[in-house]
Every structure is written in structure tokens, then in C-alpha cells.
């Protein structure tokens, strides 16, 4: 590879990484709190806890913002969502929405 290309690519990736850091946590990072109840990859194993995997991103984002803003009430979710920024909510919503859910026939 040409040295100029390597330098350009390095500078570009540093710029993108800095932008991502400035925007807050990634969806996967925010999700580390969620997986305790909602399961790895959003497939819940606890009774009464909804699975998040494959849910529409806009739905997940809307619900988290309602929990954060006190418009939807759940003691646990209101506390968990409170410190999240819009960018973090959008990132974690996109992260859970990306997983496909496969249902087995009985």
C-alpha cells in the first residue's frame, strides 16, 4: 500500500472513532445494563420481561424515552432510562432491533 493511503486511512479512522466517543456509548455498551433482564441479544429469559430482539427500532426508542421522561411507569425502567441521552437510546434501540428472531414450529 502507498504510505499516503495508510496515513489518510489512519486519520479517517481516528476521526470516526472520536466522533463515536463524543456521541456517547455504543448500543452494545448501553445494552450491557439491559441484558441482565432482557437477555443476551435481547432474548429475555426472566418471566414477565419482554424480549427486545427484533422489535422495531422506533418502538424501542419511543418506549425508552417515555420511561426516561416519566411518561411510562415502571420502577426499574424509569431508573435505568433516566441517565440515557437521546443518542444512547437510539444506539441501544438500533442494537436490539438488528437481531432476528426465529420461531420454531411445535
Predicted regions and their residues:
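Bacterial N-terminal signal peptides that target proteins for export
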Residues: 1-7
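Cleavable N-terminal signal peptides
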Residues: 9-10, 20-21
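N-terminal signal peptide c-region/cleavage motif recognized by signal peptidases
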Residues: 15-19
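Sequence/structural segment immediately N-terminal to covalent heme-attachment motifs in c-type
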Residues: 21-43, 53-55, 104
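Extracytoplasmic/secreted proteins, especially bacterial periplasmic and envelope-associated proteins
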Residues: 33, 59, 76-79, 91
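Gly/Gly-Pro-rich "capping" loops immediately C-terminal to redox-active cysteine motifs
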Residues: 42-69, 78-82
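Extended intrinsically disordered, low-complexity coil regions enriched in Ser, Thr, Gly, Ala
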Residues: 71-73
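C-terminal capping alpha-helices of c-type cytochrome domains
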Residues: 82-106
